[in-house]
Amino acid sequence: MRHYYITGPERVQAFEETVPEPGPGQVLVRVAFTALSPGSNLHVFRTGGYGGSSSQPEEAVYMGSGVVEAVGDGVTRVAPGDRVASVGVGHQEYAVLSEGQVHRIHGELGLRDASLAYLPTWSVSALHLGQYAAAETVVVVGLGLVGLSAALMADQMGARVLGIEVDAQRAEFARGLRLGAVEQPGADGATEPIAEFLGDAGADLILETSGSWHGFKQAVGMARDWTRIAVMGIYRDLPPGDLALELHGLLYGFPSKFHYQRLQIIGCGSDPADVVAPNPRLATTHRNFAYTLERAAQGKLPLGKLVSHVMRPDDLESVLRRMADGDRSYVGVVFEWQAE
């Protein structure tokens, strides 16, 4: 079977491997689609490893879908023949995953669309952590795949959603999701519709997904009293000096947003895998995944609108290189391993 690895900065190589056997608690999946992470996969491609350049090949693991071929002892949630969405899968023809990494697909939801289900699932966690309440106004800063997934889930949960994206191409793609509004800060005529959408009440919750310090500044600048900023993006580099001073002034200059406006800044990982006492919350990643797939199967969560490109597996390196070179048209990229 083919299995693609990152073998150095901006190098991808396919290896031929034996199809693995599932052990106890594991599931063998015949992969149908894999999807790119615009954050971690691109970071590993650029640097050659998760912690910088590595002497060993690195898997570009993220999300996908496929059909269960076999299960190990003790597996009860899925059976051979089940269609599943998965998280933590590499770009490979077959994958052995733990039972907790696969989630059964119901109804007519296709494998292509289900391959992207992980990011909307993570968005459920972000909305939980951001203390979202129904009918609130949610601003999503950055409309790459993470931001689009978050905006789509917030919209599905009943939020008034305003998408903010500085890139014209991505803003136009985002308008296809039919959110409350999508605006491009800095473009002619954008200020008035943003102010009109937010009204006097302003933003209740801002999901900062860009991973850019400029995006974080945008989020802080849009906050009002008691606004919650839930940070989904990862800031891999230090902010430029001038921008760091601007942020310090916004957050801590008198009257500081952080103190006087009671701004909340929340880091967003995922909900726990299992309910752990004494935490009274029942939200888990498994329940969130089941919810996402259920709503998508019901036609209430159009995951297909997140797909911008369907590619062949051997296009992996060229797609990553185009993304690394700044091509912003690649948003939701999936690789087709098996025809549906």
Predicted stretch roles:
Residues 200, 230, 240, 294, ...:
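C-terminal capping/lid region of NAD(P)-dependent oxidoreductase domains
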Residues 20-36, 47-90:
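Glycine-rich beta-strand-centered segment in the early N-terminal region that forms part
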Residues 87-99:
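A structural motif shared across PLP-dependent enzymes of the aminotransferase-like
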Residues 191-195, 247-307:
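C-terminal substrate-binding/catalytic core of Rossmann-like NAD(P)-dependent dehydrogenases/reductases
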Residues 113-188, 192-193:
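Mid-domain Rossmann-like dinucleotide-binding core that forms the NAD(H)/NADP(H) cofactor-binding site
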Residues 181-263:
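Glycine-rich cofactor phosphate-binding loops and adjacent beta1-alpha1 units
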